[in-house]
């Protein structure tokens, strides 16, 4: 699941990839060891996804745009990533969010500079949601596929996908 979630980024035109690891760090490092990524360790992973955002901030401050992707979204493709990059470059919006059936998904592409102070304060599993909601005028929502919503966090998530006809490989 993790490798499939990251694959669209590895094969895209993105210049630099950072991967934040915490929970099951050794297993994740083994999965991604053959890919070009800089590893950021998150000792605070038990505090939720926002801790991963906070520990990444020193690494991303100089970048024009940064994707935030979850490790449990295996149904994304390179086309979406490239579409988001192109949309980001062609618009004056600071944040690009894919949506499916009017629901916000992942990954999120953000121009970090205007939001660094607020990103330093995010807590729990809210991630960038509060920033997206607060600065809606700076957000461009783009229609996407169901994969932007489909996370595989639990065995129940996997079983639900199987019931819908998906074949799921074991890591």
Where are these regions (language model features)?
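Conserved N-terminal catalytic core of the sugar/cofactor nucleotidyltransferase
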Residues: 2-65, 79, 121
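A generic structural signal for alpha->beta connector loops
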Residues: 14, 36, 92-93, 136-138
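Alpha-helix/helix-capping structural signal
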Residues: 23, 113-114, 147, 156
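A generic "binding-loop/recognition-motif" signal
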Residues: 24, 72, 145
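Hydrophobic residues at beta-strand termini and immediately following loops
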Residues: 40-42, 98, 142, 152
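Conserved beta-loop-beta/alpha segment of the NTase-like Rossmann-fold superfamily
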Residues: 46-112, 117
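Conserved alpha/beta core of the MobA/IspD/sugar-nucleotide pyrophosphorylase nucleotidyltransferase superfamily
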Residues: 121-171
């Amino acid at each position: 699941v993790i490798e499939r979630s990251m694959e669209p980024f590895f094969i895209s035109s993105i210049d630099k990839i950072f991967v934040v690891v915490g929970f099951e760090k050794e297993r994740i490092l083994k999965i991604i060891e053959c890919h070009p990524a800089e590893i950021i360790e998150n000792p605070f992973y038990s505090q939720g996804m926002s801790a991963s955002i906070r520990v990444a901030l020193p690494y991303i401050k100089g970048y024009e745009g940064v994707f935030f992707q979850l490790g449990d979204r295996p149904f994304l493709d390179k086309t979406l990533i490239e579409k988001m990059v192109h949309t980001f470059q062609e618009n004056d919006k600071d944040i690009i969010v894919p949506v499916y059936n009017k629901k916000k998904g992942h990954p999120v592409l953000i121009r970090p500079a205007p939001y660094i102070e607020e990103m330093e304060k995010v807590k729990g599993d809210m991630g960038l949601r509060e920033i997206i909601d607060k600065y809606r005028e700076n957000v461009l929502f783009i229609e996407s596929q169901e994969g932007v919503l489909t996370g595989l966090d639990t065995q129940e998530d996997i079983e639900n996908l199987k019931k819908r006809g998906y074949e799921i490989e074991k890591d």
